[in-house]
Amino acid sequence: MTNIRKSHPLMKIINNTFIDLPTPSNISSWWNFGSLLGICLLLQILTGLFLAMHYTPDTTTAFSSVTHICRDVNYGWIIRYLHANGASMFFICLFIHVGRGLYYGSYLFLETWNIGVILLLTVMATAFMGYVLPWGQMSFWAATVITNLLSAIPYIGTDLVEWIWGGFSVDKATLTRFFAFHFILPFIITALVIVHLLFLHETGSNNPTGIPSNMDKIPFHPYYTIKDILGATLMILILLLLVLFSPDLLGDPDNYTPANPLNTPSHIKPEWYFLFAYAILRSIPNKLGGVLALALSILILALVPALHTSKQRSMMFRPLSQLLFWMLVADFLTLTWIGSQPVEHPFIIIGQLASILYFLIILVLMPVANIIENNLLKW
């Protein structure tokens, strides 16, 4: 008799995805982040659901309802901070996951990579709308500033912004629709994740060498289930340390002041995970140019497969590309820091140089380094 997990229509899918999946025997801990992202998504949906039970998407009561969750709801404070800091963990895992893909050439799985880029954009949109919901000063002004960027689009810009706002400024209509979208998008993300996995399992996983490993596969369970449990335990430990010891470490103090359209905060900035893109936006003195650079800072990932000129897939045996990759990581961290600083000397020039370097490394230096490395192979 066939085992039920191999014959039952539903169990068969789960079995082929998480149990009997043939997996390369040499994938390192950098491959843990996919499962960690899945755990983050589940955590965000669960905590978000419980928050939505007590939250009211109305400009007059939104701020008070968040305070009520923290003060009066049983364990409301921990649910709220798990949700807020869970988003930070989500983005840390996302950035590492994308970085892993860039380093080991996983972007050559085109369908998987492109769905991944769409996922990144969707998660960013969801996080942005979630940041608006507590209706604090930074929520309100971040919503005003970021949505206003669309007014840079020629001809239709102003109409588009007013259409998104549902009026002539960020108000009740904006908050209500942002709550609706913030609620529905995680389920769309879940659907995209399934498609992402579907495409990945068509080709099988990449591995650190970038060499096909079809002759050396092992079952996902028990080898990688136990490895993923270790990764998940460490991530949850870090998240709990953050939530229980310094829940506001990554937040903005301005968001503890109720939104006031008549009083602009001295320094408007988004959450830390958007600061790199925000720094690129601010480094260009022209509004439309800044918006284009902002969009390109993420969409450039979709171009990476087309810029791959190397004969080798992974960077494991390519020292020049490795150097450029770690320069890109350092540049990303520099941009994140610059985004949190006020617009004054020397931060302006540092931001401009870091922005130029960001695009230069990806569009020019990496492909050139690949060609040089190809020629070095002939020696």
Swiss-Prot record:
Transmembrane segments: 33-53, 77-98, 113-133, 178-198, 226-246, 288-308, 320-340, 347-367
Binding site for a ubiquinone: 201
Protein name per its UniProtKB record: Cytochrome b
A GO cellular component annotation in the UniProt record: respiratory chain complex III
Main subcellular localisation: mitochondrion
Species, as recorded: Dicotyles tajacu (Collared peccary)
GO molecular function: metal ion binding; ubiquinol-cytochrome-c reductase activity
Superkingdom of the source species: Eukaryota
GO BP term (any one): mitochondrial electron transport, ubiquinol to cytochrome c
